[in-house]
Amino acid sequence: MTKGAIFGAVAILTGALAAAPIPKGKEPPPATDKQRDLARDHLKQLMLAFHNYESALGHFPHDLADKKGKPILSWRVAILPYFDRAGAGDELYKKFALDEPWDSETNKPLIAEMPKFYKPVRVEAEAGRTFLRGFAGNGALFEPGKKRRVIDIAGADGTSNTIGIIEAGESVVWTKPESDIAFDPKKPLPPLGKDIDGVFHAARLDGSILRIKRDFDEETLKAAITIAGGEVPEWGKISPPEKNR
């Protein structure tokens, strides 16, 4: 499959929504076209980096670990050299001590240099923190100890039916490992999304962007999180009508 085919379908983004109700008088103004385009571009570039990494190393990214297997840096650091735009992450990647923890004397100052692709477009967050997270748990992309390949996912639920990254309800330090959302298909999902325009977003592994409504069906979203559950998600149960996308 060509990169153009993988990323041909990219939905219009508007931002993210908090799971808790927004207090009256605190609603943000409607997103501008520029903000929508920027949010779309961030997630598109992130998924391109995922596939570039997979093409180079044979599996999707995961947290970087030390010689004993202990995670020391997030996958967000690992994919820096694989962003399509020249120099988008190469120079920053070279600054990291890849054999040291995220909060070491060398690596901790680099938290402040978080790339724009991880920054919220409209939602406030502390410097160096991102809402873009994956799911870690049984059957999810970032299941600990698993190296997921695109061929495995394509032969199971399919990349178009599987979520890679989602806008989470809580931000995390972008370089910190083991910072993805704990996932157990038998337990309720945590709050997802942040305060924008009544929806939040997820990037599917085919590169398309899914808009998710506030009152999404939880079981349908869980089906989209697993890579080999055998389900074809009913997108209408979690995504707003086409006219509102």
Predicted regions and their residues:
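Boundary at the C-terminal end of the N-terminal hydrophobic targeting segment
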Residues: 18-25
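Positively charged n-region of N-terminal signal peptides that target proteins for export
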Residues: 1-5
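Internal low-complexity, small-residue/proline-rich segments
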Residues: 26-245
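Hydrophobic membrane-insertion alpha-helices, especially the h-region
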Residues: 7-18
